[in-house]
C-alpha cells in the first residue's frame, strides 16, 4: 500500500480476519513475556530469607502478582513463606509460567492461521458480500464474557469456593498468607484496605457486565446514536478501548502507590507514606509501651519487636527514595539486609533520652539533630565546629542498643555515637551486605515504584491516544474532506477537494 511507518495499522483497518490475527499475536507476545519473565525471576530469586530479603527487595516484578492470586509454592521445594514443601501441585510458580508459555505458543499458531485464512464467511456481510463487523453485537459478546470472568473471579477464586483465595495480611504486613475471603457487602467494602471488597466488587461488577452484555446482544442501538458515536467505525472501538485501558492504568497506579488490599506490603514493599507518617515507628513504640507496662525491661521490650516490623521502619525500603532511572533491585542499592542491630537509645550527660530527627523522603543528606521528648534540640553533628554549642562531644551523648544483635551494648566514644546517630536518621539500623552483589550504596526503588511510574506514564500516553483516535473517528468526514450529506455522484480526482467544484483541477 506504500504507507509511511506511522500508518502501520491502517493495513488491517478494513480486514477483520487479519485484525483478529494481529490481536491474537499481541496476546501471544504478552503471555510469552509473562511466562518467560516468571522463569527468569524464579532462576534468580533467593527464597531463603522472606523477612530480610523478601521478593520486593530482590526486584521481583511478576512473582508478587502470582503470589497475591494464591500461588505460594515452587517445584524447587520451597514456599514463599519460608518453609519447605513436598507436593507443590501443578499450580506452582513454574506451573503458571509454563501455562503462559504454552498459551503463548497456541496463540502464535492461531495468529498465523488467521493471517493466512483471513477471508472467512463470518466476516462478510451476506447482503453486500463485503467484509464487515457487527460492532455493537461484538461489544455485547465481549461485555458478557468479561462479566462472566469477573463474576467467576470474585465468587469462586477470591472466596475460595473454587480456588485458593488471595493474599491477605494485617495492617503491618506481618502475618500475610493466602486465604479465602468473604465478600464485604456493607459500607466497609468500600475501604480500599478491606480484602472483602475485592470479592464483593468483582461479583457486583461481573453481574452488571453480564446484564449489560445481554442487553447489548438483544437491543440494537438507535440510528441517531449509532451514527452520532460512529458505531460502525472500527476506530471508535479503538478509541473507547484505549479509554478503558488508560482509566484502568490510572486507577492501578493509584492503588499501588498509595497502597490497598490489592497491593500488600509483603509482596510489593511498603509505601512512601508509611515512612512519611512514621506508621511502623508508631506501632513499634506502641508495642514497646505495652511491654513496659507489663513490667518488662527495655531490653526485653525491644527484643519482642519482630525483625520484619523493624525492617519496614527503614528508609531504604521507601519506594520514593530510589531514583526513577536507577536500574536494579533494592539489594543492588544499599545491599542485602543481614540482621537488625537493635534500637539505639541516645542520652545526654544529664540522662535525658534523645531522639534523632529522621530524614524526610526527598532529602539525600540531612543534618543530624537530636531532640528531647519535648522536641527541644539538645545535640547535633555541627557543620562548623568553631560555632558549635550542641556537638556530641560538648553534650556528652552516649548510645545504648536494645534488642537485635547489639542488645545491651553501649558506646560513649563520640565518633561511634555520631556514626550510629547518622544511621538512626534512616530508621532502624540494619547490618547490610554490600559485597555479594557489589551494591553501590545508592538507594533503589521497589517494584511498587516501577509499577506506578510505568502505569502512570503509559496511562498519560494512552489518554492522548484516546483523544487522537476519538477525534479521528468523530471528525472523519472533516479530515477526509467529504461532506456526510453529499448525495450527488462525485467523480474522484476531478477536484482538489472531493466534491468541491470550486477546486476543479486544471487540465494540463
UniProtKB/Swiss-Prot annotation:
Membrane spanning stretches: 21-36, 101-115, 140-156, 203-218, 237-252, 457-472
Localization terms from the record: Plastid, Chloroplast thylakoid membrane
One Pfam entry name: PSII
Gene Ontology BP annotations: photosynthetic electron transport in photosystem II
SUPFAM superfamilies xrefs: Photosystem II antenna protein-like
Bilayer topology annotation: Multi-pass membrane protein
Residues annotated as signal peptide: none
Cofactor-binding details, from the entry: Binds multiple chlorophylls. PSII binds additional chlorophylls, carotenoids and specific lipids.
NCBIfam families reported for this sequence: PS_II_CP47
Assembly and interaction partners: PSII is composed of 1 copy each of membrane proteins PsbA, PsbB, PsbC, PsbD, PsbE, PsbF, PsbH, PsbI, PsbJ, PsbK, PsbL, PsbM, PsbT, PsbX, PsbY, PsbZ, Psb30/Ycf12, at least 3 peripheral proteins of the oxygen-evolving complex and a large number of cofactors. It forms dimeric complexes.
Chain's role: One of the components of the core complex of photosystem II (PSII). It binds chlorophyll and helps catalyze the primary light-induced photochemical processes of PSII. PSII is a light-driven water:plastoquinone oxidoreductase, using light energy to abstract electrons from H(2)O, generating O(2) and a proton gradient subsequently used for ATP formation.
PANTHER family reported for this sequence: PHOTOSYSTEM II CP43 REACTION CENTER PROTEIN, PHOTOSYSTEM II CP47 REACTION CENTER PROTEIN
Similarity section: Belongs to the PsbB/PsbC family. PsbB subfamily.
Protein name, per record: Photosystem II CP47 reaction center protein
Name of the encoding gene: psbB
